[in-house]
Amino acid sequence: DQPGLGKTLQAIGTVTIAKAYPCLVICPAALKINWQREFKKFAGKNAMILDDRNKASWHRFFETKCCNIFITNYESLKKFFVLKVKEDARFTMKSIEFDPRISLFKSVVIDESHKCKSTKTQQSKFVEGICKGKEYILELTGTPVVNNNTDLIQQLKIMGRLEDFGGYKYFVERFCDGPKQSSNVKELNWRLSSTCFFRREKAKVLTQLPDKSRQYIEVDISNRKEYDKAEADLIQYLRTYKNADDEKVAKALRGEVMVKMGILKAISARGKIKVFSEFIHDVIDGGEKLIVFAYLKEVVQELKKIFPEAVTVTGEDNATQKQTAVDRFQNDPSCKLIILNYKSGGTGLTLTASSRVAFIEFPWTFSDCEQ
């Protein structure tokens, strides 16, 4: 589903109706407390967040019928469910020795499953191994395809559905051809919908809501000279690759070019802070709440200095701090502003207290912004 249409509630309902316990929920760290609350709210179930205190004993809570829902984040999968990772030249599923206790789970819910889109990372392989043989596997995401159709391969494999699409080789040849690695899209969409994919769109579901309106505000950045100098430096650097072959250009894009573009992006963001702050003042002085997204940590910090009463959600906050910030923004009438960065605050948080969101800068990937 698109963001905001209740994927969490649907997953809880599915697990509850199917009596698919014990259930493991894998989600971003910032969302663990929210999942725990939602299970209590909608299913009346007490869910346990896995941590160092229950690392060795969590299964006892199920065996004694005290708890049958367990929640962990992607980064902790190795700690709780992997005994050993062999240092093989080629990392495969055979390189991983899993804790036998993973066989206890009847269902696995994978929130923000696009985080498992890579076929090569340990994180994706851990999720795949944990899900193997499970009766129910639910993948939740608003953006199943972040870059191109290859993003679907590992997600389908985790669900045990890749063979329904002809296997890895056929999928790549049929649906990942061409310069954009996307082909036969209509056929792929039909086959997904016919097998394992359920998607709702806001335009079709939330028909009684007013249309979303977008406003673009053009500003003169306060550090124009610094920006022009950095831009000229980038242009001069790119000219050296005017006649370069594709391999050389690709290598450059992975290195110094991206660094220089990042510098340009940072200068631009800093230069917008003064005017952007005036916009924020206009909104909150008018009695409205506002959600602000930024990409760079230093931009969040500068805005926090200007608006010390604001709450923030960043990578430096732990799960409890993030949830506390969200709760205050949602429930405290005097808290008018929340500032988030895309990675930590862009997924899974409930921020319905405001109908206005502003972006001082965009992330590298548009889907992060849309999410």
What positions do the PLM features span?
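SF2 helicase catalytic motif II
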Residues: 90-139
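Conserved P-loop NTPase motor "coupling/switch" region that bridges the ATPase
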Residues: 21-23, 41, 65, 107, ...
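SF2 helicase/translocase ATPase core recognition
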Residues: 112, 134-166, 171, 205-234, ...
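Conserved Walker A/P-loop ATP-binding site and its immediately adjacent core
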Residues: 20-43, 146-151, 295-297
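Interdomain linker/hinge connecting the two RecA-like lobes of the SF2 helicase core
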Residues: 2-3, 113, 119-120, 149-156, ...
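Conserved helix-turn-beta segment of the N-terminal RecA-like "Helicase ATP-binding" lobe
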Residues: 31-54, 159-162
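Conserved helicase ATPase core of P-loop NTP-dependent helicases/translocases
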Residues: 57, 289-293, 301, 307-345, ...
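Walker A/P-loop
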Residues: 1-14
